[in-house]
Amino acid sequence: MKSVITTTISARDAAGRFPSRSDLESVQGNIQRSAARLEAAEKISAGHEGVVKEAGDACFAKYTYLKTSGEAGDSQDKVNKCYRDIDHYMRLINYSLVVGGTGPLDEWGIAGAREVYRALNLPASAYIAAFAYTRDRVCVPRDMSAQAAVEFIGALDYVNSLS
């Protein structure tokens, strides 16, 4: 699984070199932000059911046509799958916060997602709306500290930027 630390070590090892000063500063910054990332991961874990439900509800409220016949949410089974997908991405965001890098999202979430959504007639914009709602709903200090919110929002924005 990729993280800033494993990526730095792998790149330098492949080049047959020791990590540079800037490499070590990058790793140090990553380590210094770890407490905030872990706080965000803990808060997401504790309230993930509510976060997923609100994100899914926001998605279907914005894209009401999804529940019409022939669309991605035209049955309860399909609606449940949408919520399942949002939950899956929230877990990957959580894992990415824990490891301190985008590895879980890159390796398990993003690869092929666009093709799958296209083949199943699932609009990526609906998922983007769900994560944008989650991002905009984060409230400091109600939900988490300011630094934890920065880390969480960064992970949400990373997912949205790849869509």
UniProtKB/Swiss-Prot annotation:
Q: Which UniProt keywords apply?
A: Antenna complex, Bile pigment, Chloroplast, Chromophore, Electron transport, Membrane, Photosynthesis, Phycobilisome, Plastid, Thylakoid, Transport
* Cellular component, GO annotation: chloroplast thylakoid membrane; phycobilisome
In the bilayer, the protein is annotated as: Peripheral membrane protein
Question: Domain of life, per the record?
Answer: Eukaryota
What post-translational modification does the entry describe?
Contains two covalently linked bilin chromophores.
Q: What does this protein do?
A: Light-harvesting photosynthetic bile pigment-protein from the phycobiliprotein complex.
In the record, biological process GO terms are: photosynthesis
Subunit architecture? Heterodimer of an alpha and a beta chain.
Family affiliation: Belongs to the phycobiliprotein family.
Residue numbers binding (2R,3E)-phycoerythrobilin 2:
C139
What the entry lists under InterPro entries is as follows: Globin-like_sf, Phycobilisome_asu/bsu, Phycobilisome_asu/bsu_sf
Where can this protein be found? Plastid, Chloroplast thylakoid membrane
Q: What is the lineage of its organism?
A: Eukaryota, Rhodophyta, Florideophyceae, Rhodymeniophycidae, Ceramiales
Residues binding (2R,3E)-phycoerythrobilin 1: C82
Protein name (database record)? R-phycoerythrin alpha chain
